[in-house]
């Protein structure tokens, strides 16, 4: 009896699936990578072209275009991809929705193309982190940590425009555009007096401090494996089982420098703390941006202290308020959009008596 054996050739689709999910590839692709790669490529290519050559954009919707590209006179610092026009509002504005390419460019269509593809791409990047961790049998905390900057991007590019009613209020894609966004945000929402922003500052600056402290402590307590004439980095071999630094010495040093319980004696809890502190801080900042997007602003302590005769005793809150009003006036280039808090409030005299002339 003879048996016919068919050669089991794998289909092209099967080969593609194996390649996508193969953890031995030099760079892991993954199913999230199939979505991530084209989205980030589209966002990057459009950003570069728009940053270099996009025509001016009517960001305020009042026929006063703002130039952001390099060939229109900007440099690397002042250049930006200008947000889509206030005339577009929150409408989805792909190329096919415009009457012509010139109209699409004039109304800031490239900004939406870049931002939407970018947000999808970085979300897929987080999914790819989870996917690779899952396939390697690792715990999922890498993608959880990455969710902090991801949430910040969604807050400034999506949630804030939704709350304000127009993508023209989103953060411009450029260096000075980012600073302008921050100044206007302070002027309109008093973010410096918002508790969630304070927690975010503590997270970022505290994370930097803890990172520097940890790195310096470890580097200062390395187990000597080299001579004075060799680099200390040669004392570590990738994959070695022995500890490369003396955690007991580091713990003893820091415990005596501050006090005993300020120093971790468990390497795992230490590194969890180093990861959790800045992540939680940035989460709070993202939540703060998202709440202020709907005008739930920072605390207002303006003119909250009065003397016995009812006169205002100025505090730092009043200094912030005056600075914010000044920034808001400079930001609003058109008179019909004059800041409501200036138009409705009583005028504050800047001088008690006019100087005599002549």
From Swiss-Prot:
GO biological process, one term: photosynthetic electron transport in photosystem II
Known catalytic reactions: 2 a plastoquinone + 4 hnu + 2 H2O = 2 a plastoquinol + O2
Cofactor note: The D1/D2 heterodimer binds P680, chlorophylls that are the primary electron donor of PSII, and subsequent electron acceptors. It shares a non-heme iron and each subunit binds pheophytin, quinone, additional chlorophylls, carotenoids and lipids. D1 provides most of the ligands for the Mn4-Ca-O5 cluster of the oxygen-evolving complex (OEC). There is also a Cl(-1) ion associated with D1 and D2, which is required for oxygen evolution. The PSII complex binds additional chlorophylls, carotenoids and specific lipids.
Annotated membrane topology: Multi-pass membrane protein
Propeptide span(s): 344-358
Binding sites annotated in the UniProt record for Fe cation: 214, 271
One term of GO molecular function: oxidoreductase activity, acting on diphenols and related substances as donors, oxygen as acceptor
Annotated residues for binding of chlorophyll a ChlzD1: 117
Binding site for [CaMn4O5] cluster: 169, 188, 331-332, 341, 343
Posttranslational modification: Tyr-160 forms a radical intermediate that is referred to as redox-active TyrZ, YZ or Y-Z. C-terminally processed by CtpA; processing is essential to allow assembly of the oxygen-evolving complex and thus photosynthetic growth.
Pfam families reported for this sequence: Photo_RC
Annotated Gene Ontology cellular component terms: photosystem II; plasma membrane-derived thylakoid membrane
Cellular compartment(s): Cellular thylakoid membrane
Positions of the record's site feature: Stabilizes free radical intermediate: 189
EC number from the UniProt entry: 1.10.3.9
Keywords recorded for this protein, A-Z: Calcium, Chlorophyll, Chromophore, Electron transport, Herbicide resistance, Iron, Magnesium, Manganese, Membrane, Metal-binding, Oxidoreductase, Photosynthesis, Photosystem II, Thylakoid, Transmembrane, Transmembrane helix, Transport
Site positions per UniProt: Cleavage: 343-344
Membrane-crossing residue ranges in chain numbering: 28-45, 117-132, 141-155, 196-217, 273-287
Site description Tyrosine radical intermediate, residues in chain: 160
Residues that hold a quinone according to the record: 214, 263-264
Disulfide topology: none
Self-association and partners: PSII is composed of 1 copy each of membrane proteins PsbA, PsbB, PsbC, PsbD, PsbE, PsbF, PsbH, PsbI, PsbJ, PsbK, PsbL, PsbM, PsbT, PsbX, PsbY, PsbZ, Psb30/Ycf12, peripheral proteins PsbO, CyanoQ (PsbQ), PsbU, PsbV and a large number of cofactors. It forms dimeric complexes.
Note: Cyanobacteria usually contain more than 2 copies of the psbA gene.
Described function: Photosystem II (PSII) is a light-driven water:plastoquinone oxidoreductase that uses light energy to abstract electrons from H(2)O, generating O(2) and a proton gradient subsequently used for ATP formation. It consists of a core antenna complex that captures photons, and an electron transfer chain that converts photonic excitation into a charge separation. The D1/D2 (PsbA/PsbD) reaction center heterodimer binds P680, the primary electron donor of PSII as well as several subsequent electron acceptors.
The name this protein goes by in its record: Photosystem II protein D1 1
Species this protein is from: Synechococcus sp. (strain CC9902)
């Amino acid at each position: 009896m003879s048996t016919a054996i068919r050669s089991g050739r794998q289909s092209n689709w099967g080969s593609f699936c194996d390649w996508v999910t193969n953890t031995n590839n030099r760079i892991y692709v993954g199913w999230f990578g199939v979505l991530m790669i084209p989205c980030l490529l589209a966002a990057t290519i459009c950003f570069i072209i728009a940053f270099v050559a996009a025509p001016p954009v009517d960001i305020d919707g009042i026929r006063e275009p703002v130039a952001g590209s390099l060939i229109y006179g900007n440099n690397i610092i002042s250049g930006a991809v200008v947000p889509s026009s206030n005339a577009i509002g929150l409408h989805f504005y792909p190329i096919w929705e415009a009457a012509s390419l010139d109209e699409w460019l004039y109304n800031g269509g490239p900004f939406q193309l870049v931002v939407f593809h970018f947000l999808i791409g970085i979300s897929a990047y987080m999914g790819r982190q989870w996917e690779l961790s899952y396939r390697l049998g690792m715990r999922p905390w890498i993608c959880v940590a990455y969710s902090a900057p991801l949430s910040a991007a969604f807050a400034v590019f999506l949630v804030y425009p939704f709350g304000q009613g127009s993508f023209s209020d989103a953060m411009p894609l450029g260096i000075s555009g980012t600073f302008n966004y921050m100044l206007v945000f302070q002027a309109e929402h008093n973010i410096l007096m918002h508790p969630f922003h304070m927690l975010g500052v503590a997270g970022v600056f505290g994370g930097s401090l803890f990172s520097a402290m940890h790195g310096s402590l470890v580097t200062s307590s390395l187990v000597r494996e080299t001579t004075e004439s060799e680099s200390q980095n040669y004392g570590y071999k990738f994959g070695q089982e022995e500890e490369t630094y003396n955690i007991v010495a580091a713990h003893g040093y820091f415990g005596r420098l501050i006090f005993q319980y300020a120093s971790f004696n468990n390497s795992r809890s230490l590194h969890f703390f180093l990861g959790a502190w800045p992540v939680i801080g940035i989460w709070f900042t993202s939540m703060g941006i998202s709440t202020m997007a709907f005008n739930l602003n920072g605390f207002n302590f303006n003119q909250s202290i009065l003397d016995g005769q009812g006169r205002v005793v100025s505090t730092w809150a009043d200094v912030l308020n005056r600075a914010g009003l000044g920034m808001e006036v400079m930001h609003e280039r058109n008179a019909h959009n004059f800041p409501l808090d200036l138009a409705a409030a009583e005028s504050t005299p800047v001088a008690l008596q006019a100087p005599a002339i002549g």
